[in-house]
Amino acid sequence: MEGVFTYLGGILGEDSHSAVLIAHLLLVAVIVIMIAKMATKSFRAVPNGTQNVMEAYLGGVVAMGKDVIGEELARKYLPLVAAVGLFIFVSNVIGIIPGFESPTSNINVTLPLALMVFVYYNYEGIKKHGVVHYFAHFAGPVKLLAPLMFPIEIVSHLSRIISLSFRLFGNIKGDDLFLWVLLMLVPFVAPLPAYLLLTFSALLQTFVFMILIYVYLAGAVAIDEEHEKAPAPAIDTMGAV
């Protein structure tokens, strides 16, 4: 955030905001890699310590995705969703520590994340169904409404980039500003309850981003299932007209 002291900003210079952002991104990357290394350093049949936490996390991600896309596909996309979730959570939480900045409070971080998800789920949909079949489902099951539905679906999919990036950016930016103001008014002791609230908010925003990845992937790869669920009587009626 502009004008807010950070330890890395003190080292690199507060004016070089891009360098400070990159430094915080590298710090988050190092933390994520360290967590992964600690969890995989020595596998045990009965997990303990970091391995236990990581296995619980991965199991929770699969359980979350299973309700959306099925267990097989939830496991297939587990590496992407779990990695993105861990990165976002660490990025969110690090800003709660005074003197550090959440990389996810910057649109230059959340927008590339949203673009990555957008490109990936469309790629998966095209890979499974082919270009023609994939984009044909944008027109919907009712052919007469295709000229109306196709542009609406295109706009709807493009708007996901904005909703994913700005939801995460706006919430984390607001949390950081809230904590900053609170620390200015009543430093150290009084903000302690706020830390719990902000940690919950960081967890919630991570969950929302992860579940939306599964939702978008489900919509891209489960086209046939969607069409099968379309009400047949409505299609027959329109065809008769």
Swiss-Prot record:
Keywords: ATP synthesis, Cell inner membrane, Cell membrane, CF(0), Hydrogen ion transport, Ion transport, Membrane, Transmembrane, Transmembrane helix, Transport
Topology relative to the membrane: Multi-pass membrane protein
GO molecular function: proton-transporting ATP synthase activity, rotational mechanism
Highest taxon above the source species: Bacteria
Keyword hit for Glycosyltransferase: no
One Gene Ontology term from the biological process aspect of the record: proton motive force-driven plasma membrane ATP synthesis
Chain ranges passing through the membrane: 19-39, 80-100, 106-126, 135-155, 177-197, 203-223
Pfam assignment, any one: ATP-synt_A
Name the UniProt record assigns to this protein: ATP synthase subunit a
UniProt organism field: Sulfurovum sp. (strain NBC37-1)
Name of the coding gene: atpB
